[in-house]
C-alpha cells in the first residue's frame, strides 16, 4: 500500500541566482496568479499527495471489511463509490485512508471463527499493516494500542463476548445488527443530528412561508435594505408560546425607521390611530346639540357613578336628629326639547335650562359654601337634588333642600342658553331667587352645624325618650374601644338604676348593665378597654373581669393565710418564752429547796431537858 508513495515528489523551483520563487514576489507583476507551492515532505503530516496520484486498490479496502452483504452486480459500483468518497475525505492517517475501526473490522473478518482477542488484534496490526511493523514493542505501541481499545469500546459494530475459559480475555466480534457504513459511537449518541436537521429544515420552510405571506403586509411603508432578512424575526416562528404558527404583531403598531443595530426595537408601541375617540362634536361647545339616545346613555352612566359616590350618613358619623329629612331621588330624565323646557319655565320659577350633559359629567359635587372642610349633611342632600346629566335642571319647591351652592351654579355662567332673547328678564329673576335659596340653605347648614356642635355634657338621660330605645352594648363598646384607649365611662349608679329600662331584643340590653355590682366594675371595664386598644367582644370583657375578681380573691386568701401564719409563729414564740420562764422558776425553786435542806442539815442539835416524868 505504501509503495505508491515512493514516487518522486516535486522540488522547489529555484532561479538562476539561487533564490526561491516565493522570495521574488515583489519583482513580479501583480496580475500573475501564483499556484500554492508544495512543501517538503518532512515539514508536513500527514503526507501530502502528489498531483497525479492514483490510490491503488488493496485488500484493506473498508468496503470489503464491512459486514454488509452486497449483490454481485452492486459490489463493483459500491467499491467505486467508496473509493470516490475516500479521495474526497478529509481523514488521512499515516498508514493510509483507513481508520482504526476499519482496520479492526478487517482483522476480525479475516479470522477463521470471526472473533479475536485484544492481543490477537494487536498481533494482526503488527503483521499486516506496514506502519505498525516497527512499532510492536512496548515503548512505541502505547499510543496506537490505546486507540485500538478506544475504538473497540465506542463503536457499535464491535461486540464483546465472554470467553469460556478461566483467566482468558474476552472475544471481540462483529455485531451483525450494526448499521452499515459509518457506525455511530455509543457515547456520542447525542451528536446524531439527523432529527434536529429535519426539524430545522421544516422550521426554515415555515419561516420562509411566513416571510412571503405576512411580511409583505407589515413592510408596506418603504422598508430599508437592512430589514429584508431580519423582518421575519418579528413573527416568533419557533416560540413555545405560539406553537400553532408564527405570532404576528398587531397592525395597530407602526414600525419605526429600520436600523442595523437591532431588529427587536423596530416596532414602536405608538398606535397608528389617534387615542382620542371621535365624539362627533365641534370644537365650539356653545352651540351643542345631542340626540335623546345619547343623552339617556350618559344619564344612566353618570347616575350609576353618582350612586357609587354617595356618602352614607352612617359612615360620616351623622346623627338621625340632624333636622334635615331624607329626600327622594330626583325625577327621571326628561328629553331636551325646547318647548318642554319653556313649559317647565312657565310652571316652576326655579327652572334653569342647563348645558348639554356631555360636558357637565365631571363637575364636583355641590357643597355647602361655609362647610367645605367639614362633614356637612347638606352636601349629600344637595347632590340628591341636582342631576348634572339632565339638560333641564329642575329645582322644584317639592325639594326645598336641593338648592345647589353658588359655586356650582357658576359653572353655567359660561354657557350660552338656548332660547329666544326674551328670557333675559327671567334669568335675572331666577338668579335672584337662586341667591335667596342659597342664603336659606346656608342658614340651614349653620343650624345643623350648631346642633351637631352641642357639648355632650348637656345630654340628659332623664329627658331623653327611652320608650322604645334599644342599645347594642357590644357594638357600642367595640366602637368606643376602636379609638385607641380614649374610652372614659362616667355613669352615675343612681342614673343607671333609675333611668335605664329593660329591652327584650338585641344580644344585650341596657338593663343588663344594672346587674353590675358597683362602679368599680365599670371602671375595670374602662381600664381594660383603654389598655387593649383593639375591638374586644363583651364576652371577652366579662371573662377578663371574672379573671380579675378571681385574682383579687386569691390575693386576699393569700394575705389571710400569711396573716394566720404570722400569728401562729407569734404564738409559738410566746409559748417558747413561757416554757423558758417556767423552767427557770422551777430551777430556782429547786435550788432554793436544796439550799434550805443543806442549811438545816448543817445546824447543831439542840439539847433539851428531859421530860418531867423522867427522874
Swiss-Prot record:
UniProt biased composition (Pro residues): 326-335
GO molecular function terms attached to this record: DNA-binding transcription factor activity; DNA-binding transcription factor activity, RNA polymerase II-specific; RNA polymerase II cis-regulatory region sequence-specific DNA binding
Keyword Transcription regulation in annotation: yes
Cited function: Transcription factor involved in the regulation of the insulin signaling pathway. Consistently activates both the downstream target Thor\d4EBP and the feedback control target InR. Involved in negative regulation of the cell cycle, modulating cell growth and proliferation. In response to cellular stresses, such as nutrient deprivation or increased levels of reactive oxygen species, foxo is activated and inhibits growth through the action of target genes such as Thor.
Name recorded for this polypeptide: Forkhead box protein O
GO cellular component: cytoplasm; nucleus
Keywords assigned: Activator, Cell cycle, Cytoplasm, Developmental protein, Differentiation, DNA-binding, Growth regulation, Nucleus, Phosphoprotein, Transcription, Transcription regulation
Low complexity compositional bias, start-end: 336-351
Subunit structure: Interacts with melt.
Region (Disordered): 39-77, 182-205, 217-269, 318-359, 389-409
Modified residues (Phosphothreonine): 44
InterPro entries: Fork_head_dom, TF_fork_head_CS_2, WH-like_DNA-bd_sf, WH_DNA-bd_sf
Phosphoserine PTM sites in chain numbering: 75, 190, 259, 262-263, 268
DNA-binding region extent: 95-201
Compositionally biased residues, Polar residues: 63-77, 221-230, 256-265
Cell compartment(s), UniProt: Cytoplasm; Nucleus
Pfam families on file: Forkhead
Organism: Drosophila erecta (Fruit fly)
Top-level taxon of the source organism: Eukaryota
Gene Ontology process terms (BP): cell differentiation; glucose homeostasis; negative regulation of cell growth; negative regulation of cell population proliferation; negative regulation of insulin receptor signaling pathway; regulation of DNA-templated transcription; regulation of lipid metabolic process
Keyword Cell cycle recorded: yes
